[in-house]
Amino acid sequence: MAKSVAIGIDLGTTYSCVGVFQHGKVEIIANDQGNRTTPSYVAFTDTERLIGDAAKNQVALNPQNTVFDAKRLIGRKFGDPVVQADMKHWPFRVINDGDKPKVQVSYKGETKAFYPEEISSMVLTKMKEIAEAYLGHPVSNAVITVPAYFNDSQRQATKDAGVIAGLNVLRIINEPTAAAIAYGLDRTGKGERNVLIFDLGGGTFDVSILTIDDGIFEVKATAGDTHLGGEDFDNRLVNHFVEEFKRKHKKDISQNKRAVRRLRTACERAKRTLSSSTQASLEIDSLFEGIDFYTSITRARFEELCSDLFRSTLEPVEKALRDAKLDKAQIHDLVLVGGSTRIPKVQKLLQDFFNGRDLNKSINPDEAVAYGAAVQAAILMGDKSENVQDLLLLDVAPLSLGLETAGGVMTALIKRNSTIPTKQTQIFTTYSDNQPGVLIQVYEGERAMTRDNNLLGRFELSGIPPAPRGVPQIEVTFDIDANGILNVTATDKSTGKANKITITNDKGRLSKEEIERMVQEAEKYKAEDEIQRERVSAKNALESYAFNMKSAVEDEGLKGKISEADKKKVLDKCQEVISWLDANTLAEKDEFEHKRKELEQVCNPIISGLYQGAGGPGAGGFGAQAPKGGSGSGPTIEEVD
């Protein structure tokens, strides 16, 4: 019996790819057509079901029953605006089944409806068969990749698709992380390197920043757009030619699904041509009502049609840099992943953004993700080859995790972007005397108050022996494993009594948009808070400086050392500033600083004359008010200093 191998599958929106790690290297496996990537297409006909190239090749003849883009539906609700928007572009029907989308097709003369998981499982089955044909024996273990931005229901649904395909899914990993592994094996150089992975595929766009150091990968930040890719560029071309056809032939082909599909196929081909040539021609015989459509498009025109989409790829790059707290000069390597990164304009924008830095194209952008997934699969199967042995992969928690303490405050134990797996422990105590139990409420989010964050779960720890407030010691541990499953345990140290909750990441968690929104909101509020803090400290500094100066010149010990004229000058100016402060408590930071400069110009020459080089009394800011005790409502648990 051959030792069991595991495969790595890049389940793409438009194309999928499979690899296997054996004999110390990765093989990307070609399908029966000799192609190393396989279209993520499934077609249903009167006689059979087709998957991959065979499905894509007959799409123009059978558009209603050829399903693609299942990845855009997987793990989403029917009412999701993304689903609603995409449905307009699809020639196949999507129906609503209890707010779950299903694809309706005609198969062997019957109407059938499939869940997105089922469609994806058919593609996964095809990838599994491609690997089995190459290896010559059955394969069941696999690592499957998803975009970094997939939320938990999308990840879970992808895992379900694997199970439906008869795979034992060892792990779901992020596509950029997989690409980084592929890259890491190629680069064994010493020292820490920051790598930015720019993955623009058929359907999703991900930017990730990783630190690679001595075989250890750490994901520092991820950003992107679950809805940007090669297909969006195809759509722009399709719309352009639909308009051109209207102008030339006074006919609207947009309602004819077969015509649009044939046009789209020609557009995709033209787009690929434009990556290597500056012009591409389209020749479609009898496109609509017997009219032949012969036309051409230049690279410049294509770039113009997609200019806003191309430019929008830089925003997530900036966001990822911000999240990773890195400057663009600190990125050592830029890695291109995904077929759309072959577009010269996209490469140029990225290169210009990084001030002419060379891009790394050594990895075939279509295969990098499957390559890394295959390596990860080998690691999880315990492959002992030295290429793989010292490779470690660290993922991150997308949001901070913590619990509610007195007054509804969010106390984070695990910070956003912390490397997982991780374990954090903190001691808490009771809020009132003889409190018999505590309610542990677990939240995720970036805001200061729990009411603005997302409640993941709660549990009681009861049976705490009567004691004054602040005496009992309750140890709370947050433990996240490599799959992102969170265990929260609370233990009363005096009795050893414990209770716990396991929060799996499959149901009712936040979507990418919500995570994004919460992070953005938190960033926005954080910026507002920062401005407010600076304003208050400028006001306090001015106020204390004015009062210090006032008391300095009124000091009995200075009698005779300061002329009455100077004294009056300082006191009048101080009084003017104090009155201005009373009238302008809400002034901006700049105004407070400006007033202080004015006051210093009057006071400094006089005061420094007095103290001969000794600095005058410093302007100590007033300390912030101590926070008030938390309200009596809410879980009565308090953080121990």
From Swiss-Prot:
Domain notes: The N-terminal nucleotide binding domain (NBD) (also known as the ATPase domain) is responsible for binding and hydrolyzing ATP. The C-terminal substrate-binding domain (SBD) (also known as peptide-binding domain) binds to the client/substrate proteins. The two domains are allosterically coupled so that, when ATP is bound to the NBD, the SBD binds relatively weakly to clients. When ADP is bound in the NBD, a conformational change enhances the affinity of the SBD for client proteins.
Superkingdom classification of source: Eukaryota
Gene Ontology terms: cellular component: centrosome; cytoplasm; cytosol; nucleus; plasma membrane
CDD domains per UniProt: ASKHA_NBD_HSP70_HSPA1 (cd10233)
Compartments (UniProt record): Cytoplasm; Cytoplasm, Cytoskeleton, Microtubule organizing center, Centrosome
Modification sites for Phosphoserine: 631, 633
Xref: SUPFAM superfamilies: Actin-like ATPase domain (SSF53067), Heat shock protein 70kD (HSP70), C-terminal subdomain (SSF100934), Heat shock protein 70kD (HSP70), peptide-binding domain (SSF100920)
Functional description taken from the UniProt entry: Molecular chaperone implicated in a wide variety of cellular processes, including protection of the proteome from stress, folding and transport of newly synthesized polypeptides, activation of proteolysis of misfolded proteins and the formation and dissociation of protein complexes. Plays a pivotal role in the protein quality control system, ensuring the correct folding of proteins, the re-folding of misfolded proteins and controlling the targeting of proteins for subsequent degradation. This is achieved through cycles of ATP binding, ATP hydrolysis and ADP release, mediated by co-chaperones.
Subunit and interaction comment: May be an auxiliary component of the CatSper complex. Identified in a IGF2BP1-dependent mRNP granule complex containing untranslated mRNAs. Interacts with CHCHD3, DNAJC7, IRAK1BP1, PPP5C and TSC2. Interacts with TERT; the interaction occurs in the absence of the RNA component, TERC, and dissociates once the TERT complex has formed. Interacts with METTL21A. Interacts with TRIM5 (via B30.2/SPRY domain). Interacts with PRKN. Interacts with FOXP3. Interacts with NOD2; the interaction enhances NOD2 stability. Interacts with DNAJC9 (via J domain).
Any GO MF annotation of the entry: protein folding chaperone
N-acetylalanine sites (modified residues): 2
Protein name in UniProt: Heat shock 70 kDa protein 1B
List of residues that carry N6-acetyllysine: 77, 108, 246, 348
Annotated disulfide bonds: none
UniProt KW keywords: Acetylation, ATP-binding, Chaperone, Cytoplasm, Cytoskeleton, Methylation, Nucleotide-binding, Phosphoprotein, Stress response
Positions where Omega-N-methylarginine occurs in the chain: 469
Recorded family membership: Belongs to the heat shock protein 70 family.
Region of interest: Substrate-binding domain (SBD): 394-509
Modified residues (N6,N6,N6-trimethyllysine): 561
Residues given in the record as ATP binding sites: 12-15, 71, 202-204, 268-275, 339-342
Annotated source species: Sus scrofa
Phosphothreonine: residues bearing it: 636
Pfam families xrefs: HSP70
UniProt feature, compositional bias: Gly residues: 617-633
Region feature Nucleotide-binding domain (NBD), mapped onto this chain: 2-386
